[in-house]
């Protein structure tokens, strides 16, 4: 296995020995892991811990809306489990609803069919206050919930989730918005339902109880002709025989955090991607998988039978350095896919020899080591691919040299420096030369924004590629590719003028002509948070700030953004598209999944999962 690190200092060796001894002890041997208060703590530590617990307790810190949301979450979770099992009765409903509760039908009697093809049917409905009269009692609510779930066959694969997305504390009761999701087998295939309910609760009860529930919207997607889902989990059939999968990839990050030292780059807040390309020219796509520090990156070659072979070591690409992203692209126009890696050591370039191995051709080192995303583009139309590199946090060197401002969550401008590396071909010693032309071409404007992703596209149809950059804390950037008076490439930052600043936690970018009007549209992956949606609407949230800044924070938690390209008029955000709910959208991609000629959207989302569901 390859690593750029030189010999570890003696002090780290000693620390490693101590760590091995420590981690070999059982959990009950550890004073930090044993039940009860920690044995090794000072009075001040215990006092600080108690104060922190009080601040985290919404009831003690004055956040009554969050205290209510926490109290209502438990009965809602139980109700969701009962809905999944089916046949709700008055007894189950009485645990969460008042005896005199008011309810309406949660499933529309005549839903609107908005799509039908040989594979899927989509039904949708919105509800009006005048649609029907309220019905009284828990029996009516039980009947409404049973009717809602009537098309889903109850079984072990049935899933139901209920989450509170807004809370308003009123004297007459607590008003909430509840997001509803359910899925399972139907009569012909698989069914997925989503919806939104408006609920009023009794505030003074020890256990919150619903006094009224009214539907706001409902949608149902049903697959036809087959009991199989659209996507099948083929992990075991493809990777199951691989030792790399059994001993490495089958374990989550939480497993390795307790086994590999931080000094190797094993951290919670690392993000690792992958690259797909035909490495050996056999017409089959292969996969390069980036890994956290201390774990070898993996190259899997696809076999004719659909399985993969791990050739990482033989190919010379099993680097141990923390690697955030990779590209498989032809950099020297020889018809073979070369490898580019974004590592903590810098951007590593390896050329494909054509015999199943890779050789090092360049290592581009920056002051900033928090390198995130890579993209390849021929920005200057000279016939070879150049590289664009995004960076999240700035190094101490950059901060001192540039005198960067302090961190500002909603509009951070203290991040690392993104780089455009021009491909200048081979040098005298055989290495490939990549020249930093960031400032030269105008890409150093708004270039300290904690960038996580970037994507190139000719959005203005003028024949050259423009650049959109998604930034983690605040406004994103759109750089239009143009020419200066001398005819040289010069980018202009035009996000505000084009209407695509999109304040948020930008994590991913994808372009496609989703409405088939001849212009490329933009989809930006951000963060959706139910807790954030509740908190940012409360009067207690940032009470001394301006309304515009509060609105910015509310936007941060709304989810993803779809922008329609209206040509000379710029872009317009399409709020009614239904594409906002992507959760924590680390990656988003336009793709025509069903080959109907219309672009669909795939979103990879989530966060670290541990055995403790409360441990985020």
Where would I find each of the regions flagged by the language model?
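Acidic, glycine/proline-rich Ca2+-coordinating loop motifs
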Residues: 5-8, 14-17, 21-616
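N-terminal secretory signal peptides that target proteins for export/translocation
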Residues: 1-2
